[in-house]
Amino acid sequence: TVGDLWPLYLENGKPKRKDAWKPRYRADLEAMAVPGGEKKKRGQGVTRPGPLYPLLALPLAGVNEDTLKGWYDREAEAGKHQAARALMMFRGFLRWCAARPEYRSLTDRDAGKAAAIVESLPSNTRRTDALEAAQVPGWWAGVEQLSNRTASAYLRALLLTGARREELAALTWANVDFQWRKLTIADKGETTRMIPLSPYMAQMLATLPRVGPYVFASTGKAGRITDTRASHAKAL
């Protein structure tokens, strides 16, 4: 079954010319196939199965355009972009199987590329809001001058840490360790990761008012910063 081969793929399917998966990507591969049913670390209830988990029970020879289309349509109901990312990862698995003589005859390498599936994928829009290296000094100076000090610190912290917007917006004071200079950031899934807290950023965060559990607090309903587009536009 796919479930028998998936661990072998994780162990041996590293990209060409590389010694190993990138740790973050390897973790994402594992998360995509978890069975779920575990108690959530945050909030109530149990975790959902990973998008790829339903495919693990299939025999490799049973993975074809029809089975993948049915699987993708079901997963897309929970989230199109997550389902699309899972599909891209599974394509890598099929390529790996097709490249191995012992699995080649059982593998439909192009099952995930069928027109019926590709036409259902969400369109990828090229980002136009990314900063070029030459723009950073001017952008930084503009952000520093913002009257909203919380928005100013938040925007600079995004650039300094490389964290996702929602991850950083949800940062609480309990997850800021000024003594050991680190931040604990909640990932998309149920995991966390550590980010070093530079002296500059530590000083910047220390100037923010502690008016609630969130570092980047707001008077809005969420209690934390949610939309900085207006402040960002002023800095540009």
Where are these regions (language model features)?
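Active-site/catalytic core of tyrosine-dependent DNA strand-transfer enzymes
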Residues: 31, 38, 93, 130-137, ...
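Basic, Lys/Arg- and aromatic-enriched nucleic-acid-binding interface segment
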Residues: 19, 75-91, 99-170, 179-180, ...
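Basic/aromatic-enriched alpha-helical hairpins
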Residues: 2-77, 93-95, 120, 234
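Solvent-exposed, non-membrane alpha-helical residues enriched in polar/charged side chains
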Residues: 7, 11, 73, 137-140, ...
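Bulky hydrophobic/aromatic "packing anchor" residues in well-ordered structure
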Residues: 6, 68, 111-115, 139, ...
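Residue-level detector of conserved, well-ordered beta-strand and adjacent loop positions
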Residues: 69, 140, 186, 198, ...
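A structural signal for short hydrophobic beta-strand segments in well-ordered beta-sheet cores
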Residues: 174-176
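Hydrophobic (often cysteine-bearing) scaffold residues that line and stabilize catalytic clefts
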Residues: 2, 6, 22-25, 29, ...
